[in-house]
Amino acid sequence: MTNIRKTHPLMKILNNAFIDLPTPSNISSWWNFGSLLGLCLIMQILTGLFLAMHYTPDTSTAFSSVAHICRDVNYGWFIRYLHANGASMFFICLYAHIGRGLYYGSYMFQETWNIGVLLLLTVMATAFVGYVLPWGQMSFWGATVITNLLSAIPYIGTTLVEWIWGGFSVDKATLTRFFAFHFILPFIIMALATVHLLFLHETGSNNPTGIPSNMDMIPFHPYYTIKDILGALLLILTLLALTLFTPDLLGDPDNYTPANPLSTPAHIKPEWYFLFAYAILRSIPNKLGGVLALLLSILILIFIPMLQTSKQRSMMFRPFSQLLFWTLIADLLTLTWIGGQPVEHPYIIVGQLASILYFLLILVLMPAVGLIENKLLKW
């Protein structure tokens, strides 16, 4: 009798995705982040569900309801901090996953890559609307500043902003709709992630060499299931350490002050995972220009497959491209640091130079070096 996992209509899908899936024998720990992102998503949905049972999306009670969760609900403080720091872990995994894709040329699977970019945008939108919900000072002013950027759109900008706000400022209507978005988006992310996986399994995984590995595959289970479990344990350990020892390390103290439309915080800044984009936005002294640069800083990922000039897929055997890749990482870390600094000398000029370098590396230097490496290999 054939095993039920190979015949049952539902089990067959799971079997082909997680058990009998042929996988390259040489994929490194950088390939762990996909499963870790799945784990993060499940954790966020579960903790978020329990938080939503006690949260009230109303300007007069939102802040108090979060305080109530932390003080009065059984393990409410734990669920709340798991959810907040879980978002940080989510973005760490997300950026590592994208970095892996850039380094090893995984972006050559175009459908998978494009859905991945769409997933990134959806996760960023979810994190943004979620940050507004506690209704602290940074929640309110972050929402005001970021939604206001849409007013830079010619002709329809102002109307669009007021439509999103549901009034003439960020108020009760805004909070209610942001809660609705924050609740629905993770399920959209889940659906997109399934499609992401579907397209990946059409081609099979890439591997560190970038060379087709059809002749050297091993079953996903037990080899990569055990490897994924190790990654998951390390992720959970890190998340628990962060949550139980320094739960507010990555948060903003301003968000412990209830939202006050009459008092602007000295430094309005987003959570750490958006700082690089925020620095790019601020580095252009023009509203529309800044908004376009902000959008392009993320959407540039869509154009990466078109900018591939090297005849080798992976950077594994391309030392000059590796140098530029790590320069890009250093540049992004610089932008992240600048995004958290006040707008004054020398931070302004450093941010502008880092922003120029970011686009220069991706659009000009990396494709040029790819061509040079081809020449060096007489290809």
UniProtKB/Swiss-Prot annotation:
Membrane topology summary: Multi-pass membrane protein
The record's free-text note on cofactor binding: Binds 2 heme b groups non-covalently.
UniProt keyword annotation of Magnesium present: no
Binding site for a ubiquinone: H201
Keyword Protein biosynthesis attached: no
Chain segments annotated as transmembrane: 33-53, 77-98, 113-133, 178-198, 226-246, 288-308, 320-340, 347-367
Residues holding heme b b562: H83, H182
Positions contributing to heme b b566 binding: H97, H196
GO biological process per UniProt: mitochondrial electron transport, ubiquinol to cytochrome c
UniProt subcellular location: Mitochondrion inner membrane
PROSITE patterns: CYTB_CTER, CYTB_NTER
GO cellular component terms, semicolon-separated: mitochondrial inner membrane; respiratory chain complex III
Any single Pfam family the record assigns to this protein: Cytochrome_B
A molecular-function term among this protein's GO annotations: metal ion binding
Alphabetic keyword roster: Electron transport, Heme, Iron, Membrane, Metal-binding, Mitochondrion, Mitochondrion inner membrane, Respiratory chain, Transmembrane, Transmembrane helix, Transport, Ubiquinone
InterPro entries (alphabetical): Cyt_b/b6_C, Cyt_b/b6_C_sf, Cyt_b/b6_N, Cytb/b6-like_sf, Cytochrome_b, Cytochrome_b_C_euk/bac, Cytochrome_b_N_euk/bac, Di-haem_cyt_TM
Matching SUPFAM superfamilies: a domain/subunit of cytochrome bc1 complex (Ubiquinol-cytochrome c reductase) (SSF81648), Transmembrane di-heme cytochromes (SSF81342)
Cofactor(s) needed by this chain: heme b
General remark: Heme 1 (or BL or b562) is low-potential and absorbs at about 562 nm, and heme 2 (or BH or b566) is high-potential and absorbs at about 566 nm.
Family of the protein in this entry: Belongs to the cytochrome b family.
PANTHER family the record matches: CYTOCHROME B
Record's function text: Component of the ubiquinol-cytochrome c reductase complex (complex III or cytochrome b-c1 complex) that is part of the mitochondrial respiratory chain. The b-c1 complex mediates electron transfer from ubiquinol to cytochrome c. Contributes to the generation of a proton gradient across the mitochondrial membrane that is then used for ATP synthesis.
Quaternary structure and partners: The cytochrome bc1 complex contains 11 subunits: 3 respiratory subunits (MT-CYB, CYC1 and UQCRFS1), 2 core proteins (UQCRC1 and UQCRC2) and 6 low-molecular weight proteins (UQCRH/QCR6, UQCRB/QCR7, UQCRQ/QCR8, UQCR10/QCR9, UQCR11/QCR10 and a cleavage product of UQCRFS1). This cytochrome bc1 complex then forms a dimer.
Protein name (Swiss-Prot/TrEMBL): Cytochrome b
